[in-house]
Amino acid sequence: MQLSKYKNQSVAVFGLGKTGLSVINVLIKSGAKAYAWDDSKEQMANAKTMYKECNFIHPKKYDWHEIKALILSPGVPISYPKPHWIVKLARSFDCKIKSDIELFLEAKAKNQKIVGVTGTNGKSTTTSLIGHILKSAGKKVAIGGNLGVPILDLEKDAEIYVIEISSFQLELINMPAVIPVHDHTFFSGSQYRAAWMIKRVSEMTKKMTEVTKRMAGMIKVDISVLLNITLDHIDRHGSMENYIAVKSKLIGGSKVAVIGCDNEITADIFNKFTGNKIPISGVRSLLDDKKGAEIQEISLKLENHNLSASDAKINLTSNAENIAASCAVCKLLKVDSSTIIDGIKSFSGLKHRNELLGKIENVLFVNDSKATNAESSKKAILSYKNIYWIVGGRSKEGGIESLSKHFARIRKALLIGESTEVFASTMENKVDYVRCCNLEDAFRLAFEEAIKSKEKTTILLSPACASFDQWRNFEERGEAFCRMFEKLRDSFTITRVV
């Protein structure tokens, strides 16, 4: 990837994780004069070792009148809870702040197609599934963005780029599109009520419609996918209005928008959006029988082609929305239905996302560590019965109150982490629960009870919480659960999960 417009130009990079390092690499190869900084001494030391040609000077010493742009890593806050000092500094000199995604969109060839995927839940799986199907169809595809490989590190000659884009990344693109809302108590924990939020959806999306008008044609992707929007990341975006506006930025400049309609907020966005659009649903048919993909608990039907749940490697129920979006995108890219079905059949899914680990006698073990909010856990809970549910961590806004209607599927809840007492209060007189010291304690207690049952049972790690109270990330939490399962199965006969 060549950033020719920045040749001989001074460009600053802040944040030296994977994204920042990829930006430095491309800038240097493109002949730009790169400046870089990070608050972390460790990250600075690593970057200095890798890129001798880069100027590692404190930003306060830059000649900001010479800096063409500041390329910011997505982890750096630009508004909430308060702007990072580098953001304030750049703005004081009217310096343009950009993301690596903007650099990529500026540099890509006109004939290269971009599929951008966002949403609160399901982004990574949908991005990966679309890419997998397109590769199965013989397309030259690159997959990345927020998922794994930074966008500027992707191969430069791909025919189609399938890019996962998080709200943190979208926030950096055309930042004036964010609606400032300074009332930080708008969705304060105990006062939050889902029903009240839904009443505000129409009001929010009226504002959002004006946002999409202003940003139309600015974020140029060929196909955008907006899966769903549920309460999340309010600590970063300041309010639900801001979060909705940021998530919706992707659809404004796309040639076609694929929008989920199982979610109240995105359904309202679909109704108000005036551009080219396709509705998708994982629970009902939105198009006529000849065009739509119908996903049931035991099978998937696409035109005259069928896939039974027993032949799929992923759970069709919990992945229904992801599959519907993938079908829509691949049909738009001229992939035939038979190839789409074969691609879904051969897709193994992603680790820590409703991942079937194996069976020990009557007990199925499922690692859904990526479920960091209630809506994500809901999909896993609806996929199984007689569940021993390991849940808890650092709770998100709204907790697990929205899952109360599904508690009948829970045999017992095993509570871990900071959220234990809050979740215990939610579950009181509704479901049997036990407080556990840690994940290992919960795993042991769950298996001791589950193995005694003559019925088929499921031990499900689906925390509905962030992992940061005990782990560095959801991957570390999930890997710990996987190791516990592997250690346990050594003394039992393994039945292959089908």
Swiss-Prot record:
Its EC number is 6.3.2.9. Cell wall formation. Catalyzes the addition of glutamate to the nucleotide precursor UDP-N-acetylmuramoyl-L-alanine (UMA). Belongs to the MurCDEF family. GO terms for molecular function: ATP binding; tetrahydrofolylpolyglutamate synthase activity; UDP-N-acetylmuramoylalanine-D-glutamate ligase activity. It is found in: Cytoplasm. GO terms for cellular component: cytoplasm. Pathway: Cell wall biogenesis; peptidoglycan biosynthesis. It comes from the Bacteria. HAMAP family: MurD. Keywords: ATP-binding, Cell cycle, Cell division, Cell shape, Cell wall biogenesis/degradation, Cytoplasm, Ligase, Nucleotide-binding, Peptidoglycan synthesis. It is an enzyme of class 6 (ligase). One of its GO terms (biological process) is cell wall organization. This is UDP-N-acetylmuramoylalanine--D-glutamate ligase. Gene3D superfamilies: Mur ligase, C-terminal domain (3.90.190.20), Mur-like, catalytic domain (3.40.1190.10), NAD(P)-binding Rossmann-like Domain (3.40.50.720). ATP binds at G119, T120, N121, G122, K123, S124, T125. Signal peptide: none annotated. The gene is murD. It catalyses: UDP-N-acetyl-alpha-D-muramoyl-L-alanine + D-glutamate + ATP = UDP-N-acetyl-alpha-D-muramoyl-L-alanyl-D-glutamate + ADP + phosphate + H(+).
